[in-house]
């Protein structure tokens, strides 16, 4: 045979192998039994972007929901002390129909509800950082920090230097940061902490050539635990932009400081994540000390992750939506809901519940913002009121319902938070916290404009087409 024939055979074999790999991958996607929307999204990517699509699926598409970060036996040891404290307290009951939500989290997430907590709410990073630094300098035994972003800038260095000061005083400090969220941060930034005896770990490290499908599963939590009795949780990372904002306008976010046994849940979340990376199980009594705070808040610290059997926070939010009788207000920077959440919001709005959704007028990510806008027509058609925040960038993840239920945390209303990220939220079942967060929402509403369905439908066809195309990829963003 001449060279041309051999070349033709070689090309044919390459094409055959290539299409065999693509078809096999599509077959695997179908067998994974995900939601039809997500399955079709991956099939479209593999079909129209065959080479790039296969690579994207290899790193971002494979499911890890059947894996476990920690054995059941290990988790039982870790939760032994919080469980003892939970059993010692009088029976706790939430108001009206919110009890079912609390029971759901207790059973599915092992999120134990505790009464008698105190909650401080922050709507700006300056106030939160001020109190965080005060608590760091008050620490006597340990400080645990877990952040998606811990930048090497003025804010990050301020917190790092405070941690170093306390480490020199003998306080045990552990820092856990997400490897992708902090990929721009030079190693020297963390090396300075390591040299001072601070334990620092990166979550699910991503290094070439050791890429794995876990590059898609990031730790989006923002948790601080100090001496086992004070905690911080919310939407704020440790970075200067959370203080100064992005370009024009401020950065609007929500964070909370917790005092009381509800902090046990944050501690359990941190120690579980620490074990997942370091394989060291920390269960000593000093991490779950006796707490005698006199507060009036009933709360739960709830987590979700891509390796558990259920999508805990997403399912809890659906229950919260469906329990609404008078109103349901939510703030989120990204709105790419799955079918279940979108239908729940539409259904209660159609039933006469006052549903309000607040989003930033300008997003920080073009693709995700365009995808978010594609859902607004359907929401308004069902009677959901859409408020676009125009004073700056709204990064707050806040929900309040019926003056009885509220939550603050790291979870966005999008596929990524619901299915791919490690997230954490604090849920509160008292009127005072709900009213505080409701007042914050209504104050922010003054810096928004109410979107009109009539005006919204007049936007250009170019925008409509762009939004619709991006929406096809929503399950993958």
Features from the language model and the residues they span:
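Catalytic-core elements of nucleic-acid end-processing and repair enzymes
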Residues: 397
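N-terminal localization/anchoring segments of enzymes in phospholipid and broader phosphate metabolism
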Residues: 1-315, 319, 323, 347, ...
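Active-site donor-binding acidic/aromatic loop of nucleotide-activated sugar
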Residues: 386-390
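Helical hairpin unit composed of two closely spaced alpha helices linked by a short loop
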Residues: 334-356, 360, 365-367
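Phosphate-/nucleic-acid-contacting segments
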Residues: 327
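Short, glycine/polar-rich helix-capping loops at beta-to-alpha or helix-loop-helix junctions
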Residues: 372-375
């Amino acid at each position: 045979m001449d060279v041309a024939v051999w070349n033709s055979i070689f090309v044919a074999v390459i094409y055959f192998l290539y299409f065999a790999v693509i078809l096999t991958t599509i077959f695997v996607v179908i067998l994974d039994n995900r939601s039809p929307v997500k399955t079709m999204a991956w099939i479209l990517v593999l079909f129209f972007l065959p080479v790039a699509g296969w690579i994207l699926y290899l790193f971002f598409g494979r499911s890890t929901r059947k894996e476990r970060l920690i054995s059941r036996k290990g988790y039982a040891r870790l939760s032994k002390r919080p469980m003892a404290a939970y059993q010692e307290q009088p029976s706790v009951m939430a108001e009206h129909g919110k009890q079912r939500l609390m029971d759901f989290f207790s059973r599915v997430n092992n999120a134990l509800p505790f009464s008698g907590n105190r909650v401080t709410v922050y709507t700006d990073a300056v106030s939160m950082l001020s109190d965080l630094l005060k608590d760091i300098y008050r620490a006597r035994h340990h400080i645990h920090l877990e952040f998606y972003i811990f930048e090497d800038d003025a804010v990050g260095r301020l917190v790092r230097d405070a941690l170093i000061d306390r480490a020199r005083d003998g306080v045990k400090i552990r820092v856990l940061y997400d490897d992708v969220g902090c990929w721009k941060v030079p190693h020297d930034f963390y090396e300075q902490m390591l040299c001072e005896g601070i334990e620092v770990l990166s979550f699910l490290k991503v290094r070439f050539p050791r890429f794995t499908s876990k590059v898609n599963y990031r730790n989006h939590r923002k948790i601080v635990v100090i001496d086992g009795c004070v905690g911080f949780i919310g939407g704020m990372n440790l970075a200067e932009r959370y203080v100064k904002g992005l370009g024009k306008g401020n950065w609007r976010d929500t964070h909370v400081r917790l005092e009381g046994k509800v902090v046990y849940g944050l501690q359990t979340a941190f120690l579980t994540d620490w074990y997942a990376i370091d394989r060291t199980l920390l269960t000593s009594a000093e991490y779950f000390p006796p707490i005698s705070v006199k507060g009036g808040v009933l709360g739960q610290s709830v987590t979700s992750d891509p390796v558990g059997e259920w999508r805990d926070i997403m399912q809890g939010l659906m229950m919260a939506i469906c329990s609404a009788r008078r109103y349901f207000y939510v703030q989120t920077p990204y709105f790419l809901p799955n079918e279940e959440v979108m239908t729940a919001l539409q259904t209660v709005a159609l039933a006469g519940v006052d549903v309000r959704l607040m989003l930033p007028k300008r997003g920080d990510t073009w693709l995700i913002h365009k995808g978010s806008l594609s859902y607004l027509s359907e929401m308004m058609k069902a009677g959901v009121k859409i408020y676009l925040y125009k004073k700056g960038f709204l990064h707050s993840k806040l929900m309040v319902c019926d003056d009885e239920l509220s939550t603050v945390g790291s979870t966005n209303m999008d596929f990524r938070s619901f299915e791919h990220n490690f997230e954490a939220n604090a849920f509160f079942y008292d009127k005072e916290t709900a009213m505080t967060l409701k007042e914050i929402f209504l104050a922010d509403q003054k810096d928004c404009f109410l979107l009109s369905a009539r005006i919204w439908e007049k936007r250009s066809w170019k925008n409509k087409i762009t939004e619709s195309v991006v929406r096809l990829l929503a399950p993958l963003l």
